[in-house]
UniProtKB/Swiss-Prot annotation:
Residues linked to a lipid group, S-palmitoyl cysteine type: 361
Annotated compartments: Cell membrane
Topology within the bilayer: Multi-pass membrane protein
UniProt protein name: Neuromedin-K receptor
Species of origin: Mus musculus (Mouse)
PTM annotation: The anchoring of this receptor to the plasma membrane is probably mediated by the palmitoylation of a cysteine residue.
Length: 452
């Protein structure tokens, strides 16, 4: 993560990349900082030598980035709001899913992982980085320095790839529904694999973390063996892996799913069950698209800030650059608090869960309908009920003649005719139907509860 300009950290450059979500400090630009302390101002910036005394320049820059108390108080409130909403909101989401059997679906297990990642980043990363950025002083010791540089990349990786797993799962459920869905065990394996890959990606941040005690100042930073260019390259790779690549995958999958679900009605699809499942699937996909778009918007300004300040190092001397950084970092961290709000607004079952969680509030009323939303299922899926679906393929309906019991008429006992579109897979009293379908609406083992 790009470092925030402060009185002691104004020269960021490519060395000030920091941890992807977490290290505000300049200490990532420790070489430049030490050069400045030694009086080598020009070499620190890579600028021509000036006649101005380094101590005078240092004092001017320090004054430039000193914030008034009222501004620090406002930023503290803004960051505190993010932490409070993100931690408590995501913990409630986890409780809603794990405490109610009806909520334990494949998609929701990935939402638990997403909520855990977001709550962890908010609790262990946001305020610590804000304090470090404002005071340019590391108060939290060597062990937490390593954790601070390591964990944010891990958590953001887990968050974005949980969303990616949901997108792929939705794609498989809607585009190729007859294939078996992920089991609970397979889902846990996927989640475990996500965290293992996240740990591997973030491990260099832990390995190269350092504490430097300066006169009157303690710094936490990442010192790469080959210097700032290696650090810059690493974080470009991180941006690609935790932002560009997963967003590309989700963009493609949700585009295909959206075309399928909103591409128009299928002729003859008038069954109530079909419309119920279609509506439920649309709601879930719409909710997840909003979650993904929110994440992308929140993190984009921060990544732009990082790239621009790394390439154009003179931007780090702009008098408003610290405010730009604090704003972009706040927006990135705020992505952790929006998901519970989105779930509550767009999903009636999560809304019922939040009502139960806040039932102690005098203005929150939990109705009997809200209780039923979390405790009952709409129907129990079976092989037979799942075939009671909509088919895009032509199927053959075998009609059994009422006179099939008459031996004299056994020769015309049954005949094959094209399926009546008006039947749409729904029950019909005059005949029994047997069809093999390839439905884009239902899989053989999926109920409406999976989507609504």
């Amino acid at each position: 993560m790009a470092s925030v300009p402060t009185g002691e950290n104004w020269t960021d450059g490519t060395a000030g990349v920091g941890s992807h979500t977490g290290n505000l400090s300049a200490a990532l630009g420790i070489t430049e900082w030490l050069a400045l302390q030694a009086g080598n101002f020009s070499s620190a910036l890579g600028l021509p030598v000036t006649s101005q005394a380094p101590s005078q320049v240092r004092a001017n820059l320090t004054n430039q980035f000193v914030q008034p108390s009222w501004r620090i108080a406002l930023w503290s409130l803004a960051y505190g709001l993010v932490v409070a909403v993100a931690v408590f909101g995501n913990l409630i989401v986890i409780w809603i899913i794990l405490a109610h059997k009806r909520m334990r679906t494949v998609t929701n297990y990935f939402l638990v992982n997403l909520a855990f990642s977001d709550a962890s980043v908010a609790a262990f990363n946001t305020l610590v980085n804000f304090i470090y950025g404002v005071h340019s002083e590391w108060y939290f010791g060597a062990n937490y320095c390593r954790f601070q540089n390591f964990f944010p990349i891990t958590a953001v990786f887990a968050s974005i790839y949980s969303m990616t797993a949901i997108a792929v799962d939705r794609y498989m459920a809607i585009i190729d529904p007859l294939k078996p869905r992920l089991s609970a065990t397979a889902t846990k394996i996927v989640i475990g694999s996500i965290w293992i890959l996240a740990f591997l990606l973030a491990f260099p941040q832990c390995l190269y973390s350092k504490i430097k005690v300066m006169p009157g100042r303690t710094l936490c930073y990442v010192q790469w063996p080959e210097g700032p260019k290696q650090h810059f390259t690493y974080h470009i790779i991180v941006i690609i892996l935790v932002y560009c690549f997963p967003l590309l995958i989700m963009g493609v999958t949700y585009t295909i799913v959206g075309i399928t679900l909103w591409g128009g009605e299928i002729p003859g699809d008038t069954c109530d069950k079909y419309h119920e499942q279609l509506k439920a699937k649309r709601k879930v996909v719409k909710m997840m698209i909003i979650v993904v778009v929110t994440f992308a918007i929140c993190w984009l300004p921060y990544h732009v800030y990082f790239i621009l300040t790394a390439i154009y190092q003179q931007l780090n001397r702009w008098k408003y650059i610290q405010q730009v950084y604090l704003a972009s970092f706040w927006l990135a961290m705020s992505s952790t608090m929006y998901n519970p709000i989105i779930y509550c607004c767009l999903n009636k079952r999560f809304r019922a869960g939040f009502k139960r969680a806040f039932r102690w509030c005098p203005f929150i009323q939990v109705s009997s309908y809200d209780e039923l939303e979390l405790k009952t299922t709409r129907f129990h899926p079976t092989r037979q009920s799942s075939l009671y679906t909509v088919s895009r393929m032509e199927s053959v309906t075998v009609l059994y003649d009422p006179s099939e019991g008459d031996p004299a008429k056994s020769s015309r006992k049954k005949r094959a005719v094209p399926r009546d579109p008006s039947a749409n897979g729904c029950s019909h009293r005059e005949f029994k139907s047997a069809s093999t379908t390839s439905s884009f609406i239902s899989s053989p083992y999926t109920s409406v509860d999976e989507y609504s």
